[in-house]
Regions:
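Membrane-embedded alpha-helical bundles of multi-pass enzymes
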Residues: 1-186
Length: 186
């Protein structure tokens, strides 16, 4: 949120490293759901606070502030929990493929969140690039949800680099960084 895309490099990378390092401790698939839900709740709690400000103008609506502040992020976090629940069924042996699976699952559940129950397409991770108009020009070609998957993959590069096991993973990081620089320049 807040158009500071650099924050996503830290949050996604640290979260992905946490999941990979806790793989042996997270024996139950529900634990992945729990951590995904907590990640989503924190994200939506921090980025949807502004809804409560709209409820302060009328005295009768102030009673809805706790509902808007807690229940909306709680509900939306279920989608991230479901994404990580499905992620838990994949074998944890190659970090590059896991990062791509992680990105695709998050992207799919962002799409579902944006279209189910009349949709809630707010706060996609790609929106953190909204101040970089040059970067988001590709939206006219591939669409918001596709760029969202690419951005999540891009945000996981530091995690892949930290967790690297082979030279091919370093090569993957370099290629993806070059693609990102290309998009930022052109």
């Amino acid at each position: 949120p807040y158009n500071y895309f650099i924050i996503n490099f830290f949050t996604f990378s640290l979260f992905f490293i946490f999941l990979i390092n806790k793989n042996n401790l997270l024996r139950k698939n529900f634990n992945y759901f729990k951590y995904g839900w907590l990640f989503g709740f924190g994200y939506f709690f921090a980025s949807l606070y502004w809804i409560t400000i709209a409820l302060t103008f009328d005295e009768h609506l102030k009673i809805l502030i706790p509902i808007a502040l807690i229940l909306i992020p709680s509900f939306l976090a279920i989608f991230y929990g479901c994404a990580l629940y499905i992620f838990s069924f994949f074998k944890k042996n190659k970090n590059t493929s896991l990062a791509l699976i992680f990105s695709v699952l998050f992207g799919i559940f962002e799409f579902i969140r944006g279209n189910i129950l009349s949709g809630f397409p707010w706060n996609l991770f790609v929106f953190s690039f909204s101040n970089n108009l040059e970067f988001i020009q590709i939206l006219s070609i591939i669409g918001t949800y596709s760029l969202n998957i690419i951005c999540i993959s891009f945000f996981l590069i530091p995690a892949i680099f930290i967790l690297r096991k082979t030279k091919s993973e370093i090569f993957f990081c370099v290629i993806f960084i070059l693609i990102g620089i290309f998009f930022l320049i052109f």
